[in-house]
Amino acid sequence: VVKRLILFCLLFLSGCSKAILQDFSGEIYGTTYSIKIAENSSYANLESKIQNELKRVDYVFSTYKPSSEISLINNDNDLEWSNEFRNLYETSMEISALSGGAFLPKDNNGYDFSAIGKGYAIDKIAELVEQNGVKNYFIEIGGEIRSKGSKFKENWIFGIERPINSKKSPYIAFNVPKDGISIATSGEYREPNHIWGKGPRDLLSVTVAHESATYADAWATALYVLGKDQGLMTAESNGLKVFFILANGDSIQSSNWSMISP
């Protein structure tokens, strides 16, 4: 499942021209990350802490690192799980149960938290920056986000990309609530029939807004797997905030999505 989310932020208000947006960015998990802090004080000391936390989480769920916890467990069923690993597994199984098995943390190759790991890492970075006194931030890893507060009194904004053959605007923009939200998108815009092998599907992408990036990440995958009808039904029964882009470029949303203002 390819995750695509076009992200962008508003320009500064003219009255805040002296304020500096701090941006700590780099590469992790085979993708990029960016942590933006909109405070008048400098938080340069956070950069190394952020990098260390991202690397620490990588050594929990990365299936590409032979020495990661998940790799060691997949090679030794008797290995004791850490509390962190167990929590990821239990959250995965919770989403699996609520989605009728559409989200699975294990396949024939063993445990795999790829569809929940980036969201979990975002939540851990949010905990870190808040513990260090940051109240206004925008965290993005591989197109998934979590934000809180504002960008110098302006809302943070995120955009959902439309398919490349759409005749409508290339993205749909939404304000992020100032009390905080996490956003994750799952989908495939260019070759959905290649991925699924069953001709064109009715659904191109699913975007989930949730208080937790971990849950947003997992739910976006599960609902995309379910497809439009079952996905919308599952979203409604679980009170989720979900925005669907259909194969024809149109969109539908769950009733709770209205809480996310355009």
Where are these regions (language model features)?
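Mature catalytic core of soluble alpha/beta enzymes
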Residues: F8, G15-P262
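Sec-dependent signal peptide recognition
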Residues: V2-F8
